[in-house]
Amino acid sequence: MNQEPKKTQEPNIIFVSLEQTELPKFREDGRKQWVSYGQDNDFPERLLELSRRSALHGAILSSKANDAVGDGVSRKDRTADEVAFLNAPNPEYDIDELILRCAWDLALFGGFILNPVMSNDGSRVAELWHADWSRFRSGVKDEDGR
């Protein structure tokens, strides 16, 4: 039995240089009433762009948002008024769509904003809207830290 010596293979290594996104520096500017979200105040827009440019990133965000919503809000064992509100918390979409929009913002930005509209007498929430996180900025703290 004459065996040939085994040839050693060189490792096949490929280096991939991935684009790195520099995290924004949040700055208070005494001339403005809000905290800038990065140097050009555009970090939320950059996050949106990245989610659109990368199919994988967008799919991960969609999956996280859809997993958070699950089968939606159950209408079982609810009063007629509760079901009416769940079916239309505002004139444009139902509660499941509202939660999906919030879950998407939570996955992408780390937070979400709800905008409740009170009834004329102020006794109940008449409408509930999702507000686009990318359009909001934090206000500058006052002397009391609020």
Label each PLM-derived region with a short phrase.
Residues 1-144:
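Flexible, gly/proline-biased loop segments at the beginnings
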